[in-house]
Amino acid sequence: MSVKNIAVDGCTLEFQNGGGPNTAITIEPNQTSTKVKAEGKAVYKTLKFTISGYTAPATEKPNWVSGSGSGNGEITVTAEHVTIEGNKVILEGDVSESITISGQEYSGSSTVASTFTEVVKVTDAGQSKVKGA
């Protein structure tokens, strides 16, 4: 069991495979505790997000239309011993299940629907003093 930083409002989410410069990961509102804070920032009870402007890696999807991907997902909780308001906390390093990104690929002179599978990870908890396991 390893002890890790607990994710708070302002944490950083990153893709493990693609993304691109104009890709946005937008955390859905109203998922933080109204009672529990770490370093003055609200702790996440759940962490659902939407993805827009996604570009698949050229090595795997060379015909992907840049910025055409979108999808949504949720970080999977790994904490076993720390809960807030009945929910296990989200830790730095936690990842989502595989997310299906829907987008477009070039096919000749037109585009066709395509998908790519991605994983999102909490790479920075947004604070470094409060830890959980």
Sequence positions of predicted segments:
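Intrinsically disordered, low-complexity proline/glycine-rich segments
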Residues: 1-133
